[in-house]
């Protein structure tokens, strides 16, 4: 066992740097626990506000004997021109704060360097989020290998790798509506330019920031990916080859959450009582409920959210609809009551205003489908739970994840969204899927057609494969062993 080797032979010490956004921090905390379970000392470096978000989950892990500690560093907000109270990416009130936020994050280099000078035992490895390029300078200064964590799947990472090497493909497109085929890909997959996460809509300083991220990616020792070999074998193999063998698939990392409290409190504390949620779910038939959650940074306009709600109502199926960022959706709240929507659906629909215990809900026997924005965490959690996906991508890597789920894995149905929601242009884009489109897509996913049954069968099969991957002898379990042995050899050769 590697945990025995680490104790006897070399006391490995990993320092983890999660990016300050829920979708990035949640899997990084899971990774910390997985490594600590192998006897590795873990130090998580983050800001006070972000540390507070995960206090309960980490305290339970520490109380169980796992060697995890948190070191807090103050975000230099004022120095970067960032107003106080914007310590997380998902709390930014406008796109204008994006550049100051990233500048403040990368100004952490100096205080973190001082931390490393005093840290004991000396770190053997850094695991850093892709969005924190300054950690490359720390790794270089202290001669420590840096492992990168993107928070994406191999399908998406390979797509980005191929398109960066063949950038003329995207650059030569005549319009944003023109389709192109990704070359050198295991499957024939088409995209439009706005659907791939290699371009950006934010001008100016943002290009320099993303350039630093790409440069830091090139100089990292390797990459860990929250996926498993069984889920996307061809893409995992090709991406590993592209990274000269230094890519380890170690997921689904969410499966380290085995107790109810950990499942319920991943990220923020849930805004619904766990017992109340379970009572509602227990009252529904097996596989009958559609879980609807469009992520922590959903930017759909009011007109589209209304159509989504009406489509869910007309589907005549029980549903849970989670609306995060509730304070930004006051108009929707008014519409719920003024239009009579909330009253009409009260017996069949459960509205969760804020944060939901997503893993707890997805693993419940009454849930039979997941309408998702296709963020990779949610996509993987849905597939791991054996649920078919109704895909509604918004931006970033989400169109890649939709293609993987629907076209490659054949475990989902597309809602029909074909263009990203550009920040600041939501109202202009307006409604992309009307209520009839929503109703039709729900039926395609949850209905009794042969296609729907096959999608559900396939999703269940993938869920079983994902669970096997993290068990002893499974691919992800073995890859964690391989990663630790690699870093151990490196650490011993450096001494």
Curated annotation (Swiss-Prot):
Q: Which UniProt keywords apply?
A: Glycosyltransferase, Transferase
Q: How does activity depend on pH?
A: Optimum pH is 7.9.
**What reaction(s) does this enzyme catalyze?**
oleanolate + UDP-alpha-D-glucose = oleanolate 3-O-beta-D-glucoside + UDP + H(+)
Please report a single Pfam family linked to this protein. UDPGT
State the superkingdom. Eukaryota
E.C. number(s) listed in UniProt? 2.4.1.368
The protein's enzyme class: transferase
Q: Which GO terms describe its biological process?
A: saponin metabolic process
Q: Where is the active site?
A: 24 (proton acceptor), 129 (charge relay)
Binding residues annotated for an anthocyanidin, in chain numbering? 24, 396
Task: Tell me one GO molecular function of this protein.
Answer: UDP-glucosyltransferase activity
Chain sites annotated for binding UDP-alpha-D-glucose:
356, 358, 373, 376-378, 381, 397-398
Which PANTHER family does the entry link to? GLYCOSYLTRANSFERASE, UDP-GLYCOSYLTRANSFERASE 73C5-RELATED
Family (UniProt): Belongs to the UDP-glycosyltransferase family.
What role does it play? Answer: The monoglucosylated hederagenin 3-O-beta-D-glucoside is a feeding deterrent of the yellow-striped flea beetle (Phyllotreta nemorum).
What protein am I looking at?
UDP-glycosyltransferase 73C13
Organism of derivation: Barbarea vulgaris
Gene giving rise to this polypeptide: UGT73C13
